[in-house]
């Protein structure tokens, strides 16, 4: 986690995918056990509320209107394979890591599955994460990765 904090503090882009998104939150609950996350995003990760878990396959998303990652692919489908997700974003106290992102807007994109509406992409300063797998999401995923690379 120190390497991630150092990169964010220096303004160097970080991309987390799937579990890479989940660990950025403050904490999570999996199989009844609480685990601390890195804490760069406020909130927790929990089991999806759906009749069938995991959420596996192609799905549409609700892209944040000003998303940098999802620019040009707002109406596309992305590939998911996960059982846990964050259902909300809360303010995170990143000052304890000597990180101040207060000048950067938070961009939150969403997806719905079963009875859950969850964070599917989050962008805040140099931090970008996705719950879906861009590397498995065809042309839309390739464009997302190109968008992220352009931030380097």
Feature names for model-found ranges:
Residues 1-57:
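Cysteine-nucleophile active-site neighborhood
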Residues 6-9, 43-152:
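Amide-donor transfer/coupling interface in amidating biosynthetic enzymes
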């Amino acid at each position: 986690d120190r390497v991630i904090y150092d990169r964010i503090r220096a303004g160097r882009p970080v991309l987390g995918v799937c579990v890479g998104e989940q660990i950025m939150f403050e904490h999570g609950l999996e199989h009844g056990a609480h685990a601390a996350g890195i804490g760069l995003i406020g909130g927790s990760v929990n089991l999806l509320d759906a009749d069938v878990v995991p959420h596996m396959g192609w799905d549409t998303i609700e892209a944040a209107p000003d998303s940098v990652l999802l620019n040009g692919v707002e109406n596309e489908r992305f590939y998911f394979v996960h059982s846990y997700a964050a259902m909300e974003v809360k303010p995170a106290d990143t000052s304890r890591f000597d990180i101040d992102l207060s000048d950067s807007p938070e961009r939150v994109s969403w997806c719905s599955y079963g009875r859950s509406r969850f964070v599917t992409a989050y962008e805040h300063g140099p931090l970008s994460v996705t719950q879906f797998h861009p590397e498995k999401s065809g042309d839309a995923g390739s464009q997302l990765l190109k968008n992220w690379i352009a931030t380097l």
